[in-house]
Amino acid sequence: MTNPLLTPFSLPPFSAIKPEHVVPAVTKALKDCRAAVESAVAHGAPYSWENLCQPLAEVDDVLGRIFSPVSHLNSVKNSPELREAYEQTLPLLSEYSTWVGQHEGLYKAYRDLRDGDNYATLNTAQKKAVDNALRDFELSGIGLPPEAQKRYGEIAARLSELGNQYSNNVLDATMGWNKLVTDVADLAGMPESALAAAQAQAQAKEQEGYLLTLDIPSYLPVMTYCDNQALREEMYRAYSTRASDQGPNAGKWDNSPVMAEILALRHELAQLLGFDSYAYKSLATKMAKDPQQVLDFLTDLAKRARPQGEKELAQLRAFAKAEFGVDELQPWDIAYYSEKQKQHLYSISDEQLRPYFPENKAVSGLFEVVKRIYGITAKERTDVDVWHPEVRFFELYDEHNELRGSFYLDLYAREHKRGGAWMDDCVGQMRKLDGSLQKPVAYLTCNFNRPVNGKPALFTHDEVITLFHEFGHGLHHMLTRIDTAGVSGISGVPWDAVELPSQFMENWCWEPEALAFISGHYETGEPLPQELLEKMLAAKNYQAAMFILRQLEFGLFDFRLHAEYKPEQGAKILETLAEIKKQVAVVPGPTWGRFPHAFSHIFAGGYAAGYYSYLWADVLAADAFSRFEEEGIFNRETGQSFLDNILSRGGSEEPMELFKRFRGREPQLDAMLEHYGIKG
């Protein structure tokens, strides 16, 4: 039987990939990678791009193209068999990556290229790729004695395993709780769309009634709209104690020991490499200079936002008391009364807006924005093999009708699909040895409500923002003009700059001129009426300071957890969180809350000692967008400048340089505070 993963393909053959194909394909690809490394090194000096970097980029690309669909399926179509196969490949990949990072001969070959005459003949992107490779050798412990190198490899392998275990615990804990409500009176206040979804969930399980789960499209409407306080509390407890030692499934999928070991190993790894803490190691590949700069940035922002956050909460408490006679707001009351207050102040709710954002309008509106700013057109293809019938596939063409890249769009929440929204690369742009150009392909994944009862999928405005955000990442990947592996698209972009294109794209969701075609009632097609539009814009910064403070809580918690770790004390996870809450949070959290246990961003994603990146990039994005506000939000020349200077440059140059080229100066904090309506 042939292995579809080992048969060359331009797009992954999703319907043919079976769990039993995974390990043999990855093993074979790794064997080829090792052979290519040995053969390139054996070539001997003088080394050049052609005899060293290019051949390795090509085998690496094959490995990536085999592993990418596997890892993607593990996220969007998880099954016990696939999970097992995926887990078997993790140690193999980790071991290979350590082997490469500590390959003395390969390191010498790169140093020879860096110090030899050939370096001068490389273009900017190639030089950056070589410099990054040398930096990564240092960060893989190339200079360490053999014992320490061995320990580095053990730690890296164990961390990869632990991250996966953490992620599985969160997924299992999320899927491990649900509640069937048989009396609709218990769901009073819930919008029609949420009831229909809960009913469909129950029917899918052949049950009568309404099935509630901890997936966001099910959880949020209960917290926001359900009049039943006991049910809100029950769901809040289940959600905020997922994968922990507390709550309805206490101890069942507990991430406490996983986090403790992750933090201990990260610290040991950082120290092995000569860093004071993992925070220093994290910043070795980021835009921010040192931990102090990050802490100052976060603390300064907290100082500016805190007074307004306190005011927002005080107003909410006063409102709940005056209108509903509520003496004490519990954590599971905040979203509920906030929605009521928002209605009261602006007479607008997410649900009122939903009919104006049917999927087809939101998606075609997004494409229209991209066409106006960058001259890029999206065309759908229906002949592509996908992992689920609901997945769509599009190609992007520029004004010269050149294919620039393509992407899969997977919008709805499903069982066995991890929550959240993300962009991932399927194929990276790369110039091949034979001169051909491999075009980029992306995955865009969201978890929105699916169409029910013959209506199209109707999005909330927040979901439209999420769609624009992920598409911003997608454009960064697909519109790259760099064809050097390792620095094209999002590759090699420092983590605190990678959110710039995504947060930047969100701005158009608030522009009346853009909303005119992003919105359209699913029955009549009429765009958002002026009156609703004005209310929506007025409500834009409702509780903005509370939102920023929540992000600061996450950012400071993550950063201080890594920066202040002391081996003799171990991980002070809940203590650190409590301290930071005192400093920045205005909404008190219950002592049994276990937010860290499901904070996948930092324990199973790429955001360790890096969650601050969201706010850091927010500053860049707001400042970049302010140039559009000055020159016109659909100014094609401004759009071209952003495309030429930032989007298309990938990781080929330092982000600060690219930003200054577009903006003419360094970023300033003011635009961001203004965007959030914070008088700092």
Regions found by a protein language model. Name each.
Residues 78, 122, 133-137, 250-251, ...:
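Aromatic/His-enriched, Gly/Pro-containing loop or helix-boundary segments
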Residues 125, 129, 158-161, 168-213, ...:
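Active-site-proximal, well-structured secondary-structure segments within enzyme catalytic domains
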Residues 1-24, 28, 189, 197, ...:
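C-terminal, non-catalytic "cap/extension" segments appended to globular domains
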Residues 1-190, 628:
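N-terminal helix-rich structural modules
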Residues 7-21, 70-89, 112-154, 213-257, ...:
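Short His/Asp/Glu-rich catalytic/ion-coordination signatures at enzyme active sites or charged loops
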Residues 217-219, 269, 399-401, 411-414, ...:
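Short, glycine-/Ser/Thr-/acidic-enriched flexible segments
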Residues 449-467:
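Short pre-active-site segment immediately N-terminal to the catalytic Zn-binding motif
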Residues 98, 442, 465:
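Acidic/His-rich structured neighborhood in mature extracellular/periplasmic domains
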